[in-house]
Structures are given as structure tokens and as C-alpha cells.
């Protein structure tokens, strides 16, 4: 013992052991040890025993805590090493946007909401971001500077979803609510409410502007899709306020909708545990595919961008990926079964991503197509590498202090846009982005909203 402990440390240990034995009614053992060590009664009185009787237990629990911390740190080190190994030699977290992934701490923690945040949406051009909450308010922020710009009021119940888009040259903000309405706001006119769209018979869960360019759609750029607890998807003309199509097929609450990049297809998910793909370019849309596999309500859905086709084709066992000009080739969904599922254009589940410990609430593909990001009620952001068979290569722990309800990636910056190109109504991407990626500059900024009432910005 003398080889590892000093004389004073050894004496402290001996006294602690004697006091522990005495405190646990092992007096004979305590007396024997005291005798062996030559400690008389005067050297180990009642006051000394009281001082040392809990010291051994405290030391023991401290060791256990330290062991746990060491194990946690080793796990974090392993995760970081995995990230490092998966990076290309020339990639740089700060220099290569195609490999950038969010990391803590956030750039900004935006706080002003008084109730849980349900949704967030980036302006396609300016550094504005909107967030909606349970107390019927929408807040507009400058995500670049982390400042609140204004509070927008008009709904009478919880704001459930938000999206920027609309006719070319006239960006609008759409919001939907538990008050059964959709409202359109004009960012160019101090976010005045320019139109209210009634028609749904229950809470409106999701809204998405449909990108321009849908074949056979004379109102391209003017269309908005909505999903509701009334078990319908509706398509609206935002210039007139009329519902131009009502889509039925789900058997329960529809939670989310997502349009394809060309505006021809619409993806929907809900409480009936199905994922449905609709061709909305025809007068009477019918489900082209019904995908079944989730074991609980399906919370979110999104189409994969063409940049992800090569990785997803490999997962699907396809040697040649689909052409970048095609759409609705691959999709991703997340649900309350804690899983993310990747689907091909024939309705086959090509991969199930497991890792979250609670409901999956939001999904977004990395603009490079290599990664898929997800958020969950387990308070984490997870990054899945599609080039490594969907392996989780990064987990941003403690991203929020409560459930994470929403996730968005900032729209790209369009450079040297040529004549004839149009911006995507949702994120400002051009129709030709798939064939001319050099014109698109990735913005390494994501936003998350949470039940903890904060909006957080993660950026490079």
C-alpha cells in the first residue's frame, strides 16, 4: 500500500475503514484493525470516528461517478473519431459546405415565445426566419444577428406550421392553425394579413407552397398544399383564396405534406401510419403509392433531392441512379415508432434508420445529398451519412432542454441565375438546380424549434 499512498493517505484510509466497520456494527473487526495498527482509544475517539464513518462511502460513490464520466467521454471520443474517419481528406468543417454538419453550441438561442414552438420557416432570400407557437403568435427574427424583428398576431389558436413561398417576385408567408384556418401574410408590407383561407373542418397540421413548374398547372407558383386533422389534403390558389382540389384517401389525421421539386407530386403522412404519394398534376389526384411500414403515427416526410440519388440508389441495390431531372425517386419519413424510413419510387422501404430514443419530429436532407438530418423528442439532432448506408455519424446532444418539434435548413443562395430560370417557391432553388448545381451556394444554417420555447440557430 505504501507504494501507491503516502503515509498520510494510508493513515486516512485506515481511519476510514475502522470508522466504517464500527458504524456498521462490526466492532470486533474494527477493534482488531485498531490493535493491528497500534491505534489507541485516545487516537480514535468518538469525534474522530464520526468524522470518518461516511468518508469511505463518499469516496466509493465518487469513484463510480468518475468511472461513468470516463465511459461517457470515451464514447464521445469514439463518436468524434468516427466523424474524423468519415471525412474526406480535403473536407473542412468550416471550409467545405458539402460536408458541414451542425454542432453545439448554437450560434443563437432566440427567446421571446411564452409557449412551446411548433414550427419554423426560413425566408427564401433575406435573413428572416419565422416561428409559430401554442399561444397563436408568429415571431419574425433576423437569424443573422439573432434579433426579434416583430410579432405577428391573427390566429386564435395554436400555430401549427409555417412556410414561405408564393408567386414569383412576391414572397408570402403561409401559416396554419388549430383555429381551422390558413392565413397569408405579406413580408413586403410589414406582414399584413392579406388573406384567410377557411375550409378545413379541423386543425390544419401542415402547409407547403408547391414549387412552380408542375406539368399542366397553369397556376404554377400560386399553389399551396395543406394537411388537416379532417383527413383531407387541400390545394389552394393563393391569389384567389379558392380551394382548387380536395384530396381524400387517408383514414386518420394527416400530419405532414411535402411537394416534389417540380411540383408534380405530393407526399403525405399521418396517424393511419401510411405514407401516400399523390400525382397532383391531374384534375382528380389519386394515391400513386401507399407505403406501409411504420408501427406508429408518421410525423414527418420529405422528398430526397437529386443530389442524394446516387447514395440512395446504392442503398436500394440499384447500379445506376435515376437521372437528376426526375423527381419523387426517393423519400424519407419519420414517426413515433422512433424510426426513420427511406423509400424508393416503387414504394419499397430500402432502409430503416434506428437511433432516436423518442418520436422523430423533423427531417431535412443536406443540400449536398450526402446526409439526412433529423430531430426528435429525445432532444437530439442526428446526422445520418447516406454514403455509409445511413450510419449515424453525428449526434448533437442536448440541442434543446425539451422536445425538439421542428427543423429547417436555410435555403441556398442562387448565383449567376440565367434567363428563364425560376426560383423554387419553398426554398428559392432554381428549377435547373439539379442540372446546374454550380449556380447554387449552400448556406450552412439550420434552425430548430422546441417545447422549451426557444428557437436555435446552428451555423458554420
From Swiss-Prot:
Source organism of the structure: Gibberella zeae (strain ATCC MYA-4620 / CBS 123657 / FGSC 9075 / NRRL 31084 / PH-1)
Domain comment, as recorded: Dimerization mediated by the LisH domain may be required to activate dynein.
Keyword Coiled coil: yes
UniProt family annotation: Belongs to the WD repeat LIS1/nudF family.
Keyword Coiled coil among UniProt keywords: yes
Primary location recorded for the protein, binned into one broad class: cytoplasm
Spans annotated as Disordered: 82-105, 414-433
Name by which UniProt lists this protein: Nuclear distribution protein PAC1
Pfam families (alphabetical): LisH_PAC1, WD40
Ranges of compositional bias, category Polar residues: 82-92
Known role: Positively regulates the activity of the minus-end directed microtubule motor protein dynein. May enhance dynein-mediated microtubule sliding by targeting dynein to the microtubule plus end. Required for nuclear migration during vegetative growth as well as development. Required for retrograde early endosome (EE) transport from the hyphal tip. Required for localization of dynein to the mitotic spindle poles. Recruits additional proteins to the dynein complex at SPBs.
GO (cellular component) term, any one: microtubule associated complex
SUPFAM superfamilies: Lissencephaly-1 protein (Lis-1, PAF-AH alpha) N-terminal domain, WD40 repeat-like
